[in-house]
Amino acid sequence: MDAAAELTLLEACWRTVVLGIVQGLTEFLPISSTAHLKVVPVLAGWGDPGVAVTAVIQLGSIAAVIGYFRSDLLQVCRGLARALREGDWGSPDARLGIAIAVGTLPVVVAGLLIKLFWPGYETSPLRSVASIGIVSIVMALLLALAERLGQRRKQLPSVQGLDGVVVGLAQALAIIPGVSRSGSTLTASLLFGWQRSDAARFSFLLGIPAITLAGLVELKGAFAEGSVYGPLPMLLGILSAAVVSWLAIAWLLKFLQTNSTWPFVIYRLVFGVVLLALVLANPTLG
């Protein structure tokens, strides 16, 4: 990555706004925000912004999803509070809260293990352009399989704790760049019979704790001495991610009410093939 001294404030702001737009467009669509936040800067000649910077920009996305689903979250909190008081753990709101809680555990455990035992993760081959291309193709094929085999009967009010475990394990796979958190959770949900729009809704709600924790854990690292981006550029990146994320959430929920996920399957296949072709043409891209 460029040294901090080589960037003017305007250049740093421009880069983080672009990263925020990319983050907002790709966080909630099943196409991998991590992959695009890695690939777009590399193709632009900026270098990999790193895990810390991208995790902090994700805070804009989490602000958007909390704002968008604020009424759902309030209902879940009320359902859990009522369950604690009255023992009514069978209500839809309480069950959804439990599913979100248990579904968050796998990604938290995976993140802690990587933090403790894989200090070189940020520069590992998994973050290479070639690896992201391969993973994107694999995930496209899995989403195609889910779209083909899924029965699409299950709705959000029928969610159980086991759903949280299954989809949460899929979410943990998104630590691998190119997998896509929303893509892996949507794929798992469809395979287990969820309706498309309800699967997306659960994916969004399940992602709130995971994305928030990732952003907070990396917050210190993003502003560490020697970081390319300072507070103002990072703030602009967060704001642009928030606005675009809100629009992406609203669009995807409406889109999946009447459409399939095949456009995302095709996009991910093309994206992966293009990345591999670029690496073959220019091996320095990695």
Curated annotation (Swiss-Prot):
Known role: Catalyzes the dephosphorylation of undecaprenyl diphosphate (UPP). Confers resistance to bacitracin.
Note: Bacitracin is thought to be involved in the inhibition of peptidoglycan synthesis by sequestering undecaprenyl diphosphate, thereby reducing the pool of lipid carrier available.
GO biological process, one term: cell wall organization
Protein name: Undecaprenyl-diphosphatase
Location within or outside the cell: Cell inner membrane
Enzyme class (EC, first level): hydrolase
Family: Belongs to the UppP family.
Source domain of life: Bacteria
EC number: 3.6.1.27
NCBIfam families: PRK00281.2-5, undec_PP_bacA
UniProt cross-references to InterPro entries, sorted A to Z: UppP
Keywords: Antibiotic resistance, Cell inner membrane, Cell membrane, Cell shape, Cell wall biogenesis/degradation, Hydrolase, Membrane, Peptidoglycan synthesis, Transmembrane, Transmembrane helix
Record's keyword annotation contains Coiled coil: no
Coiled coil: none
Annotated HAMAP family: Undec_diphosphatase
Classification via Pfam families: BacA
Segments traversing the membrane: 17-37, 49-69, 98-118, 126-146, 159-179, 204-224, 232-252, 261-281
Catalyzed reactions per annotation: di-trans,octa-cis-undecaprenyl diphosphate + H2O = di-trans,octa-cis-undecaprenyl phosphate + phosphate + H(+)
Membrane topology: Multi-pass membrane protein
